[in-house]
């Protein structure tokens, strides 16, 4: 019995709950509209616009002005977009890219690196990827009836997320002092 391989618990498996793609333009108008078209072309979904929380005169931003757009992708499409985004980063992330709640995020400089054909009328936009990880059973915290908390032992930690990234994508996690390209 000791020689047999220990079976893994399927409830402990980590999966991607959602992937959020964000382009923050910093101004409303034509550039923001073109950025939303890039996200729509990439994800096949209609993006949502984010408004400024408060006025910043030095940046020329007014409160409630639309300054960014984002789209939330789930399922197989999220995995494909995450794979292409990590390919741009060469599967290298910094340790500080991972949060304590087991999520991680990174940014890319140019959206055309993801395989979208360059269009001069659109321009080039950078974007942020934010990945939320979960385990089976997280629904108890989100459901409408009989909500409960996810236990501490079952939550995804920073170490769990980093280990998942290294195993699933054979990724490299760098410390801040090491150089990173991308």
Curated annotation (Swiss-Prot):
It is found in: Nucleus; Cytoplasm. One of its GO terms (cellular component) is plasmodesma. GO terms for molecular function: mRNA binding; rRNA binding; structural constituent of ribosome. It comes from the Eukaryota. Its main location: nucleus. Pfam families: Ribosomal_L5 (PF00281), Ribosomal_L5_C (PF00673). InterPro entries: Ribosomal_uL5, Ribosomal_uL5_C, Ribosomal_uL5_CS, Ribosomal_uL5_dom_sf, Ribosomal_uL5_N. Disulfide bonds: none annotated. Keywords: Cytoplasm, Nucleus, Ribonucleoprotein, Ribosomal protein, RNA-binding, rRNA-binding. Signal peptide: none annotated. GO terms for biological process: translation. Component of the large ribosomal subunit. Interacts with DEK3. Component of the ribosome, a large ribonucleoprotein complex responsible for the synthesis of proteins in the cell. The small ribosomal subunit (SSU) binds messenger RNAs (mRNAs) and translates the encoded message by selecting cognate aminoacyl-transfer RNA (tRNA) molecules. The large subunit (LSU) contains the ribosomal catalytic site termed the peptidyl transferase center (PTC), which catalyzes the formation of peptide bonds, thereby polymerizing the amino acids delivered by tRNAs into a polypeptide chain. There are four genes for RPL11 in A.thaliana. Belongs to the universal ribosomal protein uL5 family. This is Large ribosomal subunit protein uL5z. It comes from Arabidopsis thaliana (Mouse-ear cress). The lineage of its organism: Eukaryota, Viridiplantae, Streptophyta, Embryophyta, Tracheophyta.
